Amino acid sequence: MIISVMSKDRPGIIADVTGAIYELNGDLADLNQTVLCGYLTMILIATFDSSVTPEDVIAKLSHTKSDIKFDAIVKRMDTPIEILKAQVPEKTYILTAHGKNKKGLVFGISSFCYQRGINILDLTTTLADNKYTMILQLDLSHITSIKNVREDLAAFAKEAGLAVVLQHNDIFRVTNEVTMK
């Protein structure tokens, strides 16, 4: 199942959510969590016995003992996790873009991608000191010419006032990955 949670941030939300999954004998596969302007959002993938329904998960989550409640959505996944994990696109690229903050930057870059059939797999943005930074993980599987994308991206970046770097995911990982030994 895929589980999405949002709440005003407080200590213990992750323990509450993962505890509810554990109490239902669920196995947590993946989790992505962030706090943005005082609100926590989390998306999780967990497997359960076939008798556990999305409604069971919602019921368990709703019985969390806290003054600050959270909103949750639970859906069954169409494809088993093992199959999804094996399907990482070979032509995955990382696009970093930064420039002076102004309205429409995310709309502009997401429209650029959409118009070319580029799927955004992951997007993170940060605003600090009036500078806006975007990091996008892109699936370029349907692109026949990376050179054309780079040329179009350079023109877009110039018009938008952004500095951009597009590199293959493997190169990005090698140069930016932190390993734990």
Segments (PLM) and residue ranges:
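A conserved regulatory-domain signal marking ACT and ACT-like small-molecule sensing domains
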Residues: 1-181
